[in-house]
Each structure stands twice: as structure tokens, then as C-alpha cells.
């Protein structure tokens, strides 16, 4: 199977290319924090030679509680993204939740993301596809990897073949997620070689069954990320925060920003090693 290349500006995303880091913060908490987080990612990825795309949400539309922080909204969020692009020269990935958001967001962001909970909403999928933007599809927690081929087909039927697939874990009973490492290969197969990336921090979520916010297992982020990259994938999707214990969303799953360089350094070493191996055909 030939691996497809999806281009994000000058970044070539493919399963057999050096991994791309899609990293940032969960939600835009403030303009100043976004600048701080982006600056650190740029510093680390430039130093280590890792291709980089900044990620954050302008609206967390699927929060569990009506009282939870959602973000600054689309208009203010796009202004922050524009400033980040102008200041640091980064590419941007962010998610959309409504059809009306697709066009204006695609005019600023380099990649628009289809949220896991909305990945089967055909009208939204078609609206995103028709922008012509690169689309990152989050695999729903309730969907098997093989079913991702149907979502890819919807996008391609609209004339857009710039698709990236992302695993963020699968439901394992109530309020828990696990990652099936065989699923990455299945998604590659059903998409005919599309780039597949791994959202390691969201995969560490562990809900309180009676609470209004997600817990997490950030103490295991390194081992889970290593496992994902060992399969041979196109990229890693990561959230970091200067103060995870006081983050406004998903702090328990976020990597402390202070250890970002050590983390990315390990991931690059592992990715380089895995992709130095010759491909073996074990299907015969």
C-alpha cells in the first residue's frame, strides 16, 4: 500500500515521513497564554527539527457542564490565530462544530478538524470538505477503525482528498478509553494510505461517572505516545499547559509545558528508529 502525502504548506504529512507534531493547548484561555505556549513549541520543534502545527480550540462546544469554560469564540479566536501565524510563522489546526464556521475558519486555519462526536454528521462533513482545506478527522470513541473509511469517502465525494485521520481512543466500558494499536493499520488500509496521527493526551481521559469534568492520566503520556509512534504513523497530536492543575479544560491529561523538550526529544528518537527499519510484508 502506497502512503499518501497531505501537504500543509511546506509540511509533508505521511505515514512514512518523519512525524509531525500537532501541538498546543486544549482551548484558547487567553491571547497571552496562547503566545506563551506557541513560543515554547516553536522553540522546541525548531531546535529538534520536528515539523510543527499549532493546535487549539476557539470553542469547546461539547463540554459536559453548562458552567464549563468554552473559549473566546470564533471571532476572537481567529484573531489570536492570525497573530500567532504572523508572529511565529506557524500553521494552525482547529476544530469546527457548525456549518457556518467552516468557510471563515478555513480562511485562517491551515487544517480544519472534524470533532469525534460529530464525525458522522454528513452535512457538516460536506461543508468542511467543500472548503478545500486539509481536514483532520477524529475517530469517534464509539466507532471502529474500519468505519473511518466511510467518512473519508464522504469527503472525497465532495472533491477533497486532503484527509488526515486521528485516533483518540475507544470506549472501554463506561467512562474509560483504551487505544487499539492495531487500529492505526486498519485506518491506513480503509483510507488507502491516508496519514494517520495519534491524539495521545485525549486518549488519557478518564471520566468521573458522576462529575462534570474529565479526569486524566498524564503520568502515562510518555509511554502511550511511545506505543503509538512505534506503529509507524504520520504524527502526534499533543496538548501541553504551563499549569495543568489549573487549566480550564482537560488539565489532568495535559503534558506540563516545562517537560515539552524532553518529551519531543524522546518521540523524535523513537520515530527516527522505527522509520529506519525496512518494511516487511507479513501478509503472505
Swiss-Prot record:
Record GO terms (molecular function): 3-deoxy-8-phosphooctulonate synthase activity
Enzyme class (EC, first level): transferase
Keywords: Cytoplasm, Lipopolysaccharide biosynthesis, Transferase
Subcellular location, record wording: Cytoplasm
Catalytically driven reaction(s): D-arabinose 5-phosphate + phosphoenolpyruvate + H2O = 3-deoxy-alpha-D-manno-2-octulosonate-8-phosphate + phosphate
Predominant place of localization: cytoplasm
One Pfam entry name: DAHP_synth_1
Biological pathway: Carbohydrate biosynthesis; 3-deoxy-D-manno-octulosonate biosynthesis; 3-deoxy-D-manno-octulosonate from D-ribulose 5-phosphate: step 2/3; Bacterial outer membrane biogenesis; lipopolysaccharide biosynthesis
SUPFAM superfamilies: Aldolase (SSF51569)
GO biological process: keto-3-deoxy-D-manno-octulosonic acid biosynthetic process
GO cellular component terms, semicolon-separated: cytoplasm
E.C. code: 2.5.1.55
Family, similarity comment: Belongs to the KdsA family.
PANTHER family xref list: PHOSPHO-2-DEHYDRO-3-DEOXYHEPTONATE ALDOLASE (PTHR21057)
Identification of the protein by name: 2-dehydro-3-deoxyphosphooctonate aldolase
Species annotation: Mannheimia succiniciproducens (strain KCTC 0769BP / MBEL55E)
Taxonomic path: Bacteria, Pseudomonadati, Pseudomonadota, Gammaproteobacteria, Pasteurellales
